[in-house]
Structure formats: C-alpha cells, structure tokens
From Swiss-Prot:
Organism, scientific name: Homo sapiens (Human)
Name of the protein described by the UniProt record: Protein N-terminal glutamine amidohydrolase
Key word Transcription regulation present: no
Subcellular locations according to the entry: Cytoplasm, Cytosol; Nucleus
Protein family membership: Belongs to the NTAQ1 family.
Molecular-function GO term, any one: protein-N-terminal glutamine amidohydrolase activity
Enzyme Commission code: 3.5.1.122
Keywords: Cytoplasm, Hydrolase, Nucleus
Reactions accelerated catalytically: N-terminal L-glutaminyl-[protein] + H2O = N-terminal L-glutamyl-[protein] + NH4(+)
One GO CC annotation: cytosol
Length: 205
C-alpha cells in the first residue's frame, strides 16, 4: 500500500491498488459503490466493517483539500463527494478516496486533518456534513440513472462509466436521498465534522 506512517504498516488494504480500481471521473458515488462490491466479492474483510460516506451540506458547497482536481494548497469546492470508510478491527480506521492526492488508503486521522482541516476556520455555509451508510445497505439501496450528469441539451458533462446504470427493484434514481443531509431522508446516519471525527477517529477506536 502507499506509505502512511507506522500505524498503517501491517494493514492490508481492502481494495486493489488505486490504478486498478473501477474509476470514472466525477462519478464518485459509483466508484465507491464498485469498491463496496469488490470488498463484498473478495471477502478479505467483513462487509459490515465498511461504510460509504457522502459529504455535502444544505448548500451543496463543500471544500475538500488534497484533491487531484486542485493541485496545490487550495481546496476543491464540490457539491458532494463520496469516500469509503473502513472501520478496521486493527484499531485504526482508513479512508479510501479515489480522487485524493493523499495515500490510498489513508489513515482516518491523517485524511481528516489534511482533507477536511477544521470547521473553525470555515464560514458556516461551507461546513461539511457526513452521511454514513453501511456498505451492504449502500449496495442494496443505491440507484442512479446518471441524469444529474447531463446538461439541459442532454449531453454528458463527463463521460459516463462503461457499465450499465446501477438500479434496484424499487428505484432507478435516488442519488439525492444520499446527498441530502436531512437525517429524516434516506439511509444511514448524518454527522457534523466534529461528530464524525469523534465517532471514527483513533481516540475512540
């Protein structure tokens, strides 16, 4: 795995190397769905240890640092982003972000410090919230017809993934229920950055 300090030395990644993962630019929700699928099929870790994490807020304006889309010290302002969280039985949790310049996977505490920094220095309208969904629930319930990636003329803003759209027996498109940070909507639990860090950071492992 990519270097990430002594705590990561004995950790065996739940995924293939970054460049071997299923990846389509600007389709982070599907990239993480495919990563959950890989973990389920390869059975190296219990799927129950893994979570899809949607990051957004009411305004759909969230700064994330250390993104490939913005080399250097500045953040990217996404409308939403999706990463995978592995709550490892080894005592350290890891974040898998296919769009970061940080290690893949990255120690949770390192990722939070470098990619999210602190809400204290961020205007309230940009503060991030986190919807954390168990990977098995994400695989079962997520659906996207990719319509959000088409412009008003029906043209793709970014080329779609080469595989068929992900759908369920009940839905062809429920992406907004995952992006929403209303705890009454959708699946999983919604956290502030402070709550997310306290829940999954190393001090509470």
């Amino acid at each position: 795995m990519e270097g990430n300090g002594p705590a990561a030395v004995h950790y065996q990644p739940a995924s293939p190397p970054r460049d071997a993962c299923v990846y389509s630019s600007c389709y982070c929700e599907e990239n993480i769905w495919k990563l959950c699928e890989y973990i389920k099929n390869h059975d190296q870790y219990p799927l129950e240890e893994c979570y899809a994490v949607f990051i957004s807020n009411e305004r759909k304006m969230i700064p994330i640092w250390k993104q490939q889309a913005r080399p250097g010290d500045g953040p990217v302002i996404w409308d939403y982003h999706v990463v995978l969280l592995h709550v490892s039985s080894g005592g350290q949790n890891f974040i898998y972000d296919l769009d970061t310049v940080l290690p893949f996977p990255c120690l949770f505490d390192t990722y939070v410090e470098d990619a999210f920094k602190s809400d204290d220095d961020i205007h309230p309208q940009f503060r991030r919230k986190f919807r954390v969904i168990r990977a098995d629930s994400y695989l079962k319930n997520f659906a996207s017809d990719r319509s959000h990636m088409k412009d008003s003329s029906g043209n793709w803003r970014e080329p779609p993934p080469p595989y068929p759209c992900i759908e369920t027996g009940d839905s062809k498109m429920n992406l907004n229920d995952f992006i929403s940070m209303d705890p009454k909507v959708g699946w999983g639990a919604v956290y502030t950055l402070s709550e997310f860090t306290h829940r999954f950071g190393s001090k509470n492992c």
